[in-house]
Amino acid sequence: MLQIFTNKKNIALMAFALMCIMANAQQKSVTLTQAGTLSSQITAEEKFNITELSVAGPINGTDILFIRQMAGTDNEANTSTNGKLTHLNLQAANLVSGGDSYYFVKKGTAKKGYGVSENNLVDHYMFSGCEKLVEVKLPASTQKINNYAFFGCKSLTSCVIPASVDHIGDNAFAQCEALKNIQIPASVATMGNAAFNKCAALETITFDDGCAITIINANTFNGCTLLKGVKLPSTVEELGKLAFANCSSLTAFTLPASFADKESDTFQNTPIKNYDVEEGNEGFSAVDGVVYNEDTTELLLYPIAREENSFTVPTQVGGIGEQAFFGAKSLKQITLSNKLTNILSKAFAQSGLTEITFPAEVTSIGKEAFSGCKALTTATFKGGPSGISEKAFFGTGLTTVTFNQMNAVPELHQQAFLTARTTINFFVPADKVDAFKQGLTAANAVSPTRFEVKPLTTSSIYGLQQEGSAVEVSRFNAAGQRISAPVRGLNIVKMANGKVVKRIEK
């Protein structure tokens, strides 16, 4: 009997709670004939209880402030109300200039107010910080979405961007942490910096057919950690600084047909395993997932999340681009092309390389080219480069650096060889020992790391000539399938010197 009574009591409590929820979930539709009058159409009791609101007719800054308060946020950052509004439909509304300021930004001791400055403009900070908003449908007549319009709307999962919008401003949707999908209409011609920065839940971005955007600006999708794929319009020519950085779920990327330029750190810390280039691109090419210039004489982008621990640079390559191998942690060994002359800044920075041999034709090593390669212990130069730039080997594990030939001491720059090791041994031709010591000291290239400069012996040269002959290039299983690591049984291993070795792995 007691159990029955308890169950009935629980059911009654649940029913009461449900009634309360339903009572609080209020919907309202309002049609205005004059901007600034929304508050006259909604009672004080309704203001903080309405959860779904549809507005038609003209609205201005005064109405936007009222809507913000209904959505739990006042006219400054981190100021809240008791509002419960989660769903806002403005498709039949028209934004008109004028009315009160709906948002204030502190600048020193002063405050700057923001309101609706133009017709059909979702202006600066319009819904910024409205953390309770879940869905927003903008006026069908909207032409622009200005800077910070939805910044920090942490619960926003959906925003319908009208087909009339031609611009999305800086940080417009930045830190909308719940936004899962976004559709960019064909009308959008420009997007500002960091437009979708740190939208951590964003999985897909769809650009409508006909979208003619030409630039993906700096930080646009930086920190979109769930973004799995994106197909850019073929009109995109440029990718900005950190545009797709820290996108930890993005593993493949296709460069558009019009693509012509990118910043060196566009994909920083993004685990790309394969790059492709859209058909029709006349400036770039992709071979086995690696990006080169059109005639494959310069290697520009290596997919840093590849599991292979070795890579052979094609024989025709004469240059390695900025940050080409940046952060390639799995890469332990690399065989460079004998035609290679230039290695640009940060080309191999923070990679997993353990040793490196530079062909005789290499003339310059760029700034921070190998910085942060903590596993790198040995560097061998078959010739004498003309210059080694600032911090080229900064923070590596180098213990031995060998110069096989040296017509003149390279131009050494500050901290070029400053490492985590206590001592670095430099081997140089005997007639260059004193000059090389002076060069290291004058440029402050090593200090405070200790170093010794020793004459190169015949045995050192012989060892150098053998360098790389035993480097593994690729590996296959017994069925002829390429593998990234040893597997049990027969392994067929191709070496850098052209030899093929059969190994039995246990």
Locations of the language-model features?
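Short, surface-exposed loop/turn motifs with a glycine/proline- and acidic-biased composition
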Residues: N477-K499
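A recurrent domain-boundary module in secreted/ectodomain proteins
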Residues: Q438-S460
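Terminal processing/anchoring signals of secreted or surface-associated proteins
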Residues: L53, V291, F436, S459-L464, ...
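Consensus positions within tandem repeat domains that build extended binding/scaffold surfaces
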Residues: D123-M126, N146-F151, G169-A174, G192-A195, ...
